[in-house]
C-alpha cells in the first residue's frame, strides 16, 4: 500500500511534466507560425523568452518563515516510506500571497489530488515553475504575468500537511533543484 502511494505520487509528477512539455511544444509551434505570418510586425504581450536577471527568479513567497521540506529524497509524510520530493516547500501563513517567480503565461491551472490547487507558469526557453497547494487562484488561466505579480494564496489543498507553497522549477518539463534559481 505504501509503495503504491509513492508510485502514484511519482506518476502524478511525471504526468504534469508531460503536460508541461506538450503545452510548451504547442506554444512553440504557434509562436513560430505567428512569427512567420507577421514577419516581425511587433506587438505587445509575452514574447516567450523570459530570462531572469542574473539567473535568479523572484522569490514566490516573500512572507515565508522557512523551508519545511527540501528537494530530493525524503521520508514521505503520508506513506512513511522514502519518496523523491520534486520541489521545495515554503512554509507561510494561510492566505499569504503567492507571486509569479518570473514573467510568463499561466499554462495550467487546476486541482490535482496530490498538488491540490496548482498553477504552472511557462517562462519560455523550456523554463516553467509550479506552484502547488494554494487556497485560491488570483489570475485566470492563460494570463500573462510579470515577475512578482500575485497569482494565488498560500493554502493546504491536496496531499498537504499544513499551509505552505510547494514550488518546483522545471526545465523542458523535468524537475530540477529550485534553490539555485531562487538565489538560496
What are these regions (language model features)?
Residues 50-184:
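Catalytic cores of peptidoglycan-degrading enzymes
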Residues 1-50:
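Alpha-helical oligomerization segments with coiled-coil/rod-like character
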Amino acid at each position: 500500500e505504501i509503495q503504491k502511494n509513492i508510485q502514484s505520487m511519482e506518476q502524478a509528477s511525471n504526468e504534469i511534466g508531460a503536460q508541461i512539455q506538450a503545452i510548451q511544444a504547442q506554444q512553440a509551434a504557434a509562436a513560430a507560425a505567428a512569427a512567420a505570418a507577421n514577419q516581425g510586425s511587433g506587438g505587445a504581450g509575452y514574447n516567450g523568452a523570459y530570462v531572469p536577471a542574473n539567473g535568479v527568479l523572484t522569490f514566490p513567497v516573500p512572507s515565508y518563515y522557512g523551508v519545511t521540506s527540501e528537494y530530493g529524497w525524503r521520508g514521505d509524510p503520508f506513506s512513511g516510506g522514502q519518496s523523491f520530493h520534486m520541489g521545495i516547500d515554503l512554509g507561510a501563513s494561510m492566505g499569504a500571497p503567492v507571486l509569479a517567480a518570473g514573467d510568463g503565461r499561466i499554462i495550467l491551472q487546476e486541482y490535482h489530488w496530490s498538488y491540490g490547487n496548482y498553477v504552472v507558469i511557462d517562462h519560455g526557453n523550456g523554463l516553467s515553475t509550479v506552484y502547488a497547494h494554494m487556497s485560491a487562484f488570483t489570475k485566470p488561466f492563460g494570463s500573462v504575468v510579470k515577475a512578482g505579480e500575485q497569482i494565488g494564496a498560500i493554502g493546504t489543498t491536496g496531499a498537504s500537511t499544513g499551509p505552505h507553497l510547494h514550488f518546483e522549477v522545471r526545465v523542458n518539463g523535468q524537475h530540477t533543484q529550485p534553490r539555485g534559481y531562487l538565489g538560496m
